[in-house]
Amino acid sequence: MENKLSFEEAISQLEHLVSKLEQGDVPLEEAISYFKEGMELSKLCDEKLKNVQEQMAVILGEDGELEPFTAVGDEA
């Protein structure tokens, strides 16, 4: 799966695959292929969401409040 996809692109592709599978007229081999691709897209979306959660935790700090911004080199 191409990790260069944005979250929105991955979700869109996943929705498209789900729509195809829900129609019910997909041959078995093709359905399995769609399912595998969908699982990869789902994993990619999950990884991207976890990354955003980690970034938000850093921004908000442990107490849930915004942390003051410190520019690189301004730590002292």
From Swiss-Prot:
It is an enzyme of class 3 (hydrolase). It catalyses: Exonucleolytic cleavage in either 5'- to 3'- or 3'- to 5'-direction to yield nucleoside 5'-phosphates. It is found in: Cytoplasm. GO terms for biological process: DNA catabolic process. One of its GO terms (molecular function) is exodeoxyribonuclease VII activity. Keywords: Cytoplasm, Exonuclease, Hydrolase, Nuclease. Its main location: cytoplasm. Belongs to the XseB family. This is Exodeoxyribonuclease 7 small subunit. It comes from Bacillus cereus (strain G9842).
